[in-house]
């Protein structure tokens, strides 16, 4: 059985946009670069040719990866979720119990996780510790950097 890849609507759209760009913009550009480099003659010492072929390999690998993830996507409409129990798609406001510093994270699929954008993978240590918990609970997260304790201040669905 094929393992489904959970993702939000926004995450699915972003991956689909990246796939479309790689197929319709990057692929033709790289093919043109290869043709130009090939026109320069001897391929054995043609750095432009080898660089373009390497870029083509990277691009085609990413296209295959995106096609696979999109084919296995289990799209979850977060706007239709509710409740005060944390699960996939929840946006959680945490307060560090040591520093009182506030952090906001949305729990998403691995394919769309981006810590800089406040999105963490459902398989991350933090998300695994949060799943099933409710607002007002305390949670201890054991991560590579050590153990941290947080209070769950808010659970939202957006």
Curated annotation (Swiss-Prot):
One GO BP annotation of this record: DNA-templated transcription elongation
Keyword tags: Coiled coil, DNA-binding, Transcription, Transcription regulation
UniProt cross-references to InterPro entries, sorted A to Z: GreA/GreB_C_sf, TF_GreA/GreB_CS, Tscrpt_elong_fac_GreA, Tscrpt_elong_fac_GreA/B, Tscrpt_elong_fac_GreA/B_C, Tscrpt_elong_fac_GreA/B_fam, Tscrpt_elong_fac_GreA/B_N, Tscrpt_elong_fac_GreA/B_N_sf
Stretches of the chain forming a coiled coil according to its record: 47-74
One of the record's GO molecular function terms: DNA binding
Annotated family: Belongs to the GreA/GreB family.
PANTHER family in UniProt: TRANSCRIPTION ELONGATION FACTOR GREA
Role this protein plays: Necessary for efficient RNA polymerase transcription elongation past template-encoded arresting sites. The arresting sites in DNA have the property of trapping a certain fraction of elongating RNA polymerases that pass through, resulting in locked ternary complexes. Cleavage of the nascent transcript by cleavage factors such as GreA or GreB allows the resumption of elongation from the new 3'terminus. GreA releases sequences of 2 to 3 nucleotides.
Protein name: Transcription elongation factor GreA
Underlying gene: greA
